[in-house]
Curated annotation (Swiss-Prot):
Gene from which this protein is expressed: Lhfpl6
Membrane topology (UniProt): Multi-pass membrane protein
CC annotations in GO: membrane
Signal peptide location: 1-23
Primary localisation category: membrane
Pfam families: L_HMGIC_fpl
Transmembrane segments: 84-104, 123-143, 166-186
Organism superkingdom: Eukaryota
Protein's name according to its UniProt entry: LHFPL tetraspan subfamily member 6 protein
Entry keyword Zinc: no
């Protein structure tokens, strides 16, 4: 099978896929923020949540439903900052995934990735990582929302966790973005083979 990638390009393709997968998994999982409410563990992502309180009519009290899911609507996301974070991080993950899949195709298709295409792909990866980084930076601005305050002991505020902890998915998303920005962007510059010029 012919490849349009150099040896460095193959490493770039694999690292691109790993960084994109890491960021996408972290973005989708609702484990960015951990806390507890009514004695049950609660976790949040940007657009998903695990465990939420509902009013039990039969017992006339609040009980925790221990299941994970998306918010019912985009407006249901607890804060404007988290809505922006969802859009920005989602766009960044989409860009990283697009480049990663193109890079993997370059392992099998000749003349798909030239030096110029590799450099453009690296630029797109840098932009994707930057968007995800911006999303990660915006996320703490939503810690003052009522839902988060209920979970974090009513003492959380912007950039103040209260009784909550940052979850593994937040680190996962940020690590994938950092790898894309720092490592993959650099490797992309050396990924494509020099194009052959055919005299037609």
């Amino acid at each position: 099978m012919a490849s349009s990638l150099t040896c460095t390009g193959v490493i770039w393709a694999l690292l691109s896929f790993l960084s994109a997968a890491t960021s996408c998994v972290g973005f989708f999982m609702p484990y960015w923020l951990w806390g507890s409410q009514l004695g049950k563990p609660v976790s949040f992502g940007t657009f998903r949540r695990c465990s939420y309180p509902v009013h039990d009519e039969s017992r006339q009290m609040m009980v925790m439903v221990e299941e994970c899911g998306r918010y019912a609507s985009f407006q249901g996301i607890p804060s404007t900052e988290w809505r922006i974070c969802t859009i920005v991080t989602g766009l960044g993950c989409g860009l990283l995934l697009l480049v990663a899949l193109t890079a993997l195709m370059g392992c099998c298709v000749s003349e798909l990735i030239s030096r110029t295409v590799g450099r453009v792909a690296g630029g797109i990866q840098f932009l994707g990582g930057l968007l995800i980084g911006a999303g990660c930076a915006l996320y703490p601005l939503g810690w003052d929302s009522e839902e988060v305050r209920q979970t974090c002991g009513y003492i959380s505020d912007q950039f103040d966790l209260g009784k909550c902890e940052i979850g593994w998915a937040y680190y996962c998303t940020g690590a994938g973005a950092a790898a894309a920005m720092l490592l993959c962007t650099w490797l992309a510059c050396f990924s494509g083979k020099k194009q052959k010029h055919y005299p037609y």
